[in-house]
């Protein structure tokens, strides 16, 4: 019988084992993710007989619309995966639902994610991610500060805040620092998604009071696929 729970630091070893099987075995990447970024996120796991079989993680994010004085707290969902030997049991879907329900009970306004491939559009729609936004890649360049060879989290965040009054940004700048070190960032604007079956999109699960129109023309910056 699967059991679902908020992950503890002790669970990271089991989550990492899933990542190594499903995503990457690159040690420098995994070291930054699990030592610097994951402790600042919330992860949820499914266990069977004490073994972690499926996991999902969420980064704390904030939606800001400076022109309208609107600010909403939410999460970016990533790292959804199940050990291959447990495929077919719908454990990932159950873990996603558990994690989303926990965050919604805590009062979060939205959770967004990006299907790794378009064939998963319907999968996430069935899990309540029904507000679809088309991604438009954005060429966003920041000049490093004088004397620096790379962008710092502060310079990137300052540039985003200066140029995009409507945006999603990290609640903890240390997450951004880690992602920059990994060179793991993509930049996008988003518009309404008219044909979600055909378009690559961001999917959002929100509480009932929030419409997808709120997120139209929002600037997104998040980890690369």
Where are the predicted features?
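Conserved GNAT acetyl-CoA-binding A-motif
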Residues: 96, 103-116
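Conserved acetyl-CoA-binding loop-helix of GNAT-fold acetyltransferases
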Residues: 82, 88-101
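Intrinsically disordered, low-complexity, positively biased terminal segments
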Residues: 142-225
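A short, internal acetyl-CoA/4′-phosphopantetheine-binding micro-motif in the GNAT/acyltransferase core
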Residues: 77-87, 225
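Conserved active-site tyrosine of GNAT-family acetyltransferases
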Residues: 123-129
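Conserved beta-strand in the GNAT
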Residues: 45, 51-61, 74-81, 112, ...
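Conserved GNAT-fold acetyl-CoA-binding loop/helix
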Residues: 16-35, 166-178
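Conserved catalytic-core motifs of GNAT/GCN5-like acyltransferases
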Residues: 63, 112-114, 130-147
């Amino acid at each position: 019988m699967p059991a679902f729970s908020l992950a503890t630091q002790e669970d990271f070893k089991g989550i990492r084992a899933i990542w190594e099987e499903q995503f990457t075995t690159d040690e420098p990447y995994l070291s930054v993710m699990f030592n610097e970024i994951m402790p600042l996120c919330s992860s949820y796991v499914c266990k069977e007989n004490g073994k972690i079989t499926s996991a999902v993680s969420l980064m704390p994010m904030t939606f800001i619309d400076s022109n309208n004085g609107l600010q909403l707290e939410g999460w970016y969902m990533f790292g959804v995966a199940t050990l291959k030997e447990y495929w077919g049991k719908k454990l990932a879907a159950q873990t996603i639902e558990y994690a989303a329900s926990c965050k919604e009970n805590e009062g979060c306004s939205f959770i967004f994610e990006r299907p790794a491939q378009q064939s998963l559009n319907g999968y996430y729609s069935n899990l309540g991610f029904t507000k679809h936004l088309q991604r438009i890649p954005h060429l966003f360049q920041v000049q490093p500060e004088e004397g620096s060879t790379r962008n710092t989290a502060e310079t990137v965040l300052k540039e985003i805040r200066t140029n995009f009054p409507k945006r999603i940004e990290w609640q903890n700048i240390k997450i951004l620092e880690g992602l920059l070190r990994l060179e793991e960032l993509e930049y996008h604007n988003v518009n309404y998604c008219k044909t979600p079956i055909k378009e690559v999109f961001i999917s959002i699960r929100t509480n009932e009071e929030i419409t997808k129109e709120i997120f139209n023309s929002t600037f997104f910056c998040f980890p690369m696929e």
